[in-house]
UniProtKB/Swiss-Prot annotation:
The keyword Repeat does not apply. Its main location: membrane. The HXXXXD motif is essential for acyltransferase activity and may constitute the binding site for the phosphate moiety of the glycerol-3-phosphate. Pathway: Phospholipid metabolism; CDP-diacylglycerol biosynthesis; CDP-diacylglycerol from sn-glycerol 3-phosphate: step 1/3. SUPFAM superfamilies: Glycerol-3-phosphate (1)-acyltransferase. It is a peripheral membrane protein. It catalyses: sn-glycerol 3-phosphate + an acyl-CoA = a 1-acyl-sn-glycero-3-phosphate + CoA. A motif (HXXXXD motif) lies at residues 308-313. This is Glycerol-3-phosphate acyltransferase.
Amino acid sequence: MSKQDSLWFKSLRWLQKKLVHTIVVPQEPFKDLNLDPEKPLVYVMKTESLSDIAALSEITGELGLPSPYEPLEVEGRSTPRVVCLEGAKPLMGKRESNEFFLSSFMDLLKAHKESPDLDIQLVPVSLYWGRTPGKEDDTMKAAVLERENPTWLRKCLMILFLGRHNFVQFSNSVSIRYMADEHGTDKRIAHKLARVARVHFSRQRKVMTGPVLPKRQALFHALINSESLKRAIQEEATSKKISEVEARAKAMEYLDEIAADYSDSLVRIAERFLTWLWNKLYKGINIKGAEQIRQLHHDGHEIIYVPCHRSHMDYLLLSYILYYQGMVPPHIAAGINLNFWPAGPMFRRGGAFFIRRSFRGNKLYTAVFREYLDQLFTKGYSVEYFTEGGRSRTGRLLAPKTGMIAMTLNSVLRGMERPVTLVPVYLGYDHVMEVATYHKELSGKKKKKESVWQVFGALRKLGNFGQGYVNFGKPITLHSFLNEQVPDWREEIASDPEQKPTWLTPVVNTLANQVMTNINDAAAVSSVTLTSLVLLASEQNALERTQLEKQLDLYLKLLKDLPYTSYTSVVEGDGKQLVTQGLELKKLQLDSDPLGDIVSIDESISIAMTYYRNNIIHLMIIPSLVASCLTQHERITRDEIKAIIADFYPLLEAELFMGVEDTDKLVEQILDLFIEQQLIREDTGFSVVETSINQLLLLAGTVSETLQRYAIIFNLLADFPEMERSDLEAESHKLAKRLGALHGITAPEFYDKNLYRTLSVKLKDLGYLKDNGNKADVERVRASANGLLRSSVRQTIVDSVAAERSA
């Protein structure tokens, strides 16, 4: 009888099963790690452990993986399914020699030497009983729950106290066939395999648990005694005419206000609460791209998460997802407005550090904050901050605030050698709890101060919020970014470390815009965002159900056949399923009559629904602009369409943070797809197939409000070429309000002054303003914009500008 079949062993497994709850990382190993189900598989574990193998055996069946107790049959010989690097640590005495375990690698290599067709996948498996990183000088806790090399007695204690927080992590497989063919099959290669595996397990543990945490007061004293803060304290004392003791005390107060106080115990409790909360709120959370971030952690990068900011839920969602994806929740830069009782202390112990909205002119606070941020980077803690500075009230990305990015870049310039990588993150929701509040704020209502009562009020309204979306975008490694932007930056900094480089501000601005572009590149298309995009382009926010389903199918084909980027995700299903989902979420309403079903957006939430539309409008804006060209011209050529897109794209890029590299190629692909779908026909030019005109008109409706804004701006520029930039912004905003009142435009962003400011800056960069404006270019773009508008809207704009001229 084998050991695992004995009554004693079965009893221990039964007891362990009652005590242990296992979380698997990644949740779908075959899919996420590209394991080949057709090839044999062997698990590699760091230490021989009956409890670890038992925990692994409980999950392998559900995942479609072979049991660790099931031997591998190779060429008629039985081989253990699990290979360990070292034996279990005994309660007393020395661990047994590793030679026995090394022989397992030798046997596998030998089998490949004898069988040229054999290709066994070595899959590293790491098990963690709890994820406490430990604290500096935390000797007592380390003695009781020493995690790296526990004896059987300590392992029993770990299972008893931390069994509900057991993580099993699978890693990318190694092909023994590749190793044998490339490096041979002798003992030297077996040693190399074992050595590489040990390094892998060591790095993996750091990814899962993070670096050790310093004692808070010890950290404060270390920071206060740093050279930069000593200088800042002396300068504060001199400038404010106070003693150095008082200045030092003020610096300590700032540190206490800013610094996080991370607690693994609170994180474990929060994990249980958040699991309940997400299950209560959402039907599921969709994640894309986590594996690349795990790899960056594994490779030793300092990771800084830069998500978009939709809701206060963002703080919780990203940390929760990272925890379940086998990464340490980051230290989060939170606005000081969230430091209210009791949430503030809880956020702080969950990893939040607090930042004032503005600290310009407060040199001591700036120095303290910068030194604290440097310390986080140096110690290897991942960090998260929101580059928008606040939550978007319109659903579009806000113009980035560059302060935190500048501080991060300065840390690199001061000599941080470890690669620092920004990870853009797109966060999306089928329902944002604050969206009704946002509309009130945009309408002029004063923003309420955050309090515990707001939290209770939100929790009282828990319901079916559909799905959540977390997409990790293309990472930006700062050393590589600097090498591209300023090839000789190292030499320049080394020659004069104290001098601020002249190129720093423009490089920071470029980096901030690249972050926002990469966030939008990772957008998630859902049933709510896509149905709102269609219905809000219709005249009464309503369509026949069959027409809506057909339009959604067209959009899905565009998004899947011409993917915006490889980081974008698109909802599964067809138009019919998306409409059903929207109805279930109560975002749409259904009215039936003898002629069929009509699906609409209720008037009371139509403005709120623009928020969800704006989340993904950038994905469909160019197809919409192409459709507008086709429907507003009886006949138009490919080159004419490309020219119009080329004129408008720089403005679209500026306001929507788009990153299309080749607009001409994209236009060609869109036109070819329209031909394939029998929406248009081509001879000497394009004409619309009469039976498909409604589909193209609906698609064109998405860009209509954007074109109206551009028409306002270029009509003003054409008639007032000497207009100052500030006047252009003010006049454009005034005419937009008039146009909205006359034509029923309710989208909040249409009246957003900041949007006109962004456009005016871009217009100056493009050479349209008076300093170097080209009248012929302005006239051409005005004609294009006017030509794509409905006649009534065009006339309102022309008449309004004429009235301004005669005023």
